[in-house]
From Swiss-Prot:
Coiled coil: none
CC cofactor note: Binds 1 Fe(2+) ion.
InterPro entries with a match to the protein in the record: Peptide_deformylase (IPR023635), Peptide_deformylase_sf (IPR036821)
Source species, domain of life: Bacteria
Keywords: Hydrolase, Iron, Metal-binding, Protein biosynthesis
Function: Removes the formyl group from the N-terminal Met of newly synthesized proteins. Requires at least a dipeptide for an efficient rate of reaction. N-terminal L-methionine is a prerequisite for activity but the enzyme has broad specificity at other positions.
GO BP, one annotated term: co-translational protein modification
Pfam families given in the database record: Pep_deformylase
The family this protein is said to belong to: Belongs to the polypeptide deformylase family.
Keyword Flavoprotein: no
Active site: 134
Residue numbers binding Fe cation: 91, 133, 137
Protein name per the record: Peptide deformylase
Amino acid sequence: MALLEVLTFPDDRLRTVAKPVEAVTPEIQKFVDDMIETMYDEEGIGLAATQVDFHQRIVVIDVSETRDEPMVLINPVITQKSGDDGIEEGCLSVPGAKGLVPRSAEVSVSALDRDGNEFSFDADDLLAICVQHELDHLDGKLFVDYLSPLKRKRIKEKLEKIKKFNAKNQ
């Protein structure tokens, strides 16, 4: 397995809309394993393929307390939404920033698993929010898009300063 580089805002590649996975091949399965390893290494609870510059509809999520129950969602689709929720969200692609994002409280999802088998599930609480957040990535959308233009600008400026600082000190 290998760690993948996570793209950071405002990288334009994060705005790419992911294409459906045509077939779950051994290469896709290896990539999924690398995504899971990267998600755990980055201490995230979810990761979309778009965030690692692979523009196919793949998401990995683990909201379990023990951090040992990864979910793989290939070609995920939210089939139903209900209720209103929202928490202060963060993102591996927007390090150090958080913002309140309106989300549905419950979602129903259909997807393929790591082996290409179809499955469906209902999610609420943190899992529902995480699914919506990660599927936004597949559509080229970031949580900062839900924030005010001023807050989004401040986050962008902060991350650009950090990037310049890191580039100078390497």
